[in-house]
Amino acid sequence: MHHIELYVSDLEASRRFWGWFLKELGYKEYQKWSSGISWKKDRFYLVIVQAKEPFLEPEYHRCRVGLNHLAFHAESKLQVDQMTEKLTAKGYRVLYRDRHPFAGGDGHYAVFCEDPDRIKVELVAPSC
């Protein structure tokens, strides 16, 4: 994949989430302008852009047609555990707590959370 561009309802809130989350995964800030920012790792980059007022409704919902979630590689199960703790400490919503860290199924060690627009984000440990 080359890049993903997400339109967001609150650029600053999304910048705080994605900037922190992606930095933890080794991404570096790549581009920045008044209505957007991107982070890059290797050859892939993720872009967030402030949606214009006429397009803020209806709010995003992952069960509608379109994107359901974004999944990222973790370096280890330990990184998944550490990120789970950090997400909680920062007040971000961790999903499927009752099944964590195997909410994706047996042998699928991951944490699921939501960004400020409720886009589901998954961080997956390597399989053994």
Curated annotation (Swiss-Prot):
SUPFAM superfamilies: Glyoxalase/Bleomycin resistance protein/Dihydroxybiphenyl dioxygenase. It comes from the Bacteria. It holds the Pfam family Glyoxalase_4. Coiled coil: none annotated. InterPro entries: Fosfomycin_Res_Enzymes, Glyas_Bleomycin-R_OHBP_Dase, VOC. PANTHER family: FOSFOMYCIN RESISTANCE PROTEIN FOSX, LYASE, PUTATIVE-RELATED-RELATED. This is Uncharacterized protein YqjT. It comes from Bacillus subtilis (strain 168). The lineage of its organism: Bacteria, Bacillati, Bacillota, Bacilli, Bacillales. The gene is yqjT.
